[in-house]
Curated annotation (Swiss-Prot):
<keyword id="KW-0949">S-adenosyl-L-methionine</keyword>
<dbReference type="Pfam" id="PF01746">
    <property type="entry name" value="tRNA_m1G_MT"/>
</dbReference>
<dbReference type="InterPro" id="IPR002649">
    <property type="entry name" value="tRNA_m1G_MeTrfase_TrmD"/>
</dbReference>
<dbReference type="GO" id="GO:0005829">
    <property type="term" value="C:cytosol"/>
</dbReference>
<feature type="binding site">
    <location>
        <position position="114"/>
    </location>
    <ligand>
        <name>S-adenosyl-L-methionine</name>
    </ligand>
</feature>
<keyword id="KW-0808">Transferase</keyword>
<comment type="similarity">
    <text>Belongs to the RNA methyltransferase TrmD family.</text>
</comment>
<comment type="subunit">
    <text>Homodimer.</text>
</comment>
<dbReference type="InterPro" id="IPR016009">
    <property type="entry name" value="tRNA_MeTrfase_TRMD/TRM10"/>
</dbReference>
<dbReference type="InterPro" id="IPR029028">
    <property type="entry name" value="Alpha/beta_knot_MTases"/>
</dbReference>
<feature type="binding site">
    <location>
        <begin position="134"/>
        <end position="139"/>
    </location>
    <ligand>
        <name>S-adenosyl-L-methionine</name>
    </ligand>
</feature>
<dbReference type="GO" id="GO:0052906">
    <property type="term" value="F:tRNA (guanine(37)-N1)-methyltransferase activity"/>
</dbReference>
<keyword id="KW-0819">tRNA processing</keyword>
<comment type="function">
    <text>Specifically methylates guanosine-37 in various tRNAs.</text>
</comment>
<keyword id="KW-0489">Methyltransferase</keyword>
<protein>
    <recommendedName>
        <fullName>tRNA (guanine-N(1)-)-methyltransferase</fullName>
        <ecNumber>2.1.1.228</ecNumber>
    </recommendedName>
</protein>
<dbReference type="InterPro" id="IPR029026">
    <property type="entry name" value="tRNA_m1G_MTases_N"/>
</dbReference>
Length: 245
């Protein structure tokens, strides 16, 4: 996969691409990440990327020209692909695990990170394929949002995680929150690991994990159960918890 990031603050991404899982993914050639300062594509002596909005109003808007030309330039480097051009914007579709899995199937992603009051509307109308938000709040720019999406997508790529099952069993990947985890020691200052996890009976352990996953979802994110295909056993557990309230 190739990921292009367009930002007027490219140095913000060095910490993400130079550490941990993403660094290893780049070193192992599972993904190529290139960060471009789209200010370099702005016309004129001073390379200005923003201007006042027509009709008045507060703040400055990112101009269409630098971003259009920067996107065209990164597309020309990968002429064999048809990239998803992703605009990070609070008005976009809420990012979730399903979207991460969808993006992970692509060959080429281009992230546009904005600043100031917003974008010239022609960028939305004629350039981007996706508008993505990481939540109902405002940040100073799109860079942090792009980092979140990029991290979530890269860890899903084949060969990136050491254990191929890690991404499959994560919270949200199964539709439920993940079950509790424990490691050694079995007794830490009187706080003990559930006996069933020490039993060695894999069938019991799997059932315990399934039940705890469902219980955690029921208690913390009941909205996720609305369209979840429950088994008969899971329905019985839910009824027990509901009746005990």
């Amino acid at each position: 996969m190739k990921i292009d990031i367009l930002s007027i603050f490219p140095d913000m991404f060095s910490g993400v691409t130079g550490n941990s899982i993403i660094k290893k993914a780049i070193e192992n050639e599972r993904v190529e990440v290139e960060v471009t300062d789209f200010r370099e594509y702005a016309e004129g002596k001073h390379h200005i990327v923003d201007d006042y909005p027509y009709g008045g109003g507060a703040g400055m808007l990112l101009k269409a020209q630098p971003i259009f030309d920067a996107v065209q330039a990164v597309k020309e480097k990968q002429p064999e692909t048809k990239p998803r051009v992703i605009l990070m914007d609070p008005a976009g579709k809420r990012f979730d695990q399903k979207m991460a899995e969808e993006f992970a199937e692509e060959e080429h992603l281009v992230f546009i990170c904005g600043h100031y009051e917003g974008y010239d509307e022609r960028i939305r109308e004629h350039l981007v394929t996706d508008e993505v938000s990481i939540g109902d709040y405002i940040l100073t720019g799109g860079e942090i949002g792009a980092m979140i999406v990029m991290d979530s997508v890269i860890r899903l790529l084949p060969g990136v995680l050491g254990n191929k099952d890690s991404a499959v069993t994560d919270s949200f990947s199964t539709g439920l929150l993940e079950h509790p985890h424990y490691t050694r020691p079995a007794d830490f200052r009187g706080m003990k690991v559930p006996d069933i996890l020490l039993s060695g009976n894999h069938a019991w352990i799997e059932e315990w994990r399934d039940k705890e996953s469902l219980k955690r979802t029921y208690e913390r994110r009941p909205d996720l159960l609305k369209n979840y295909p429950l088994t008969d056993k899971q329905k019985t557990w839910l009824k027990e918890w509901s009746d005990s309230k």
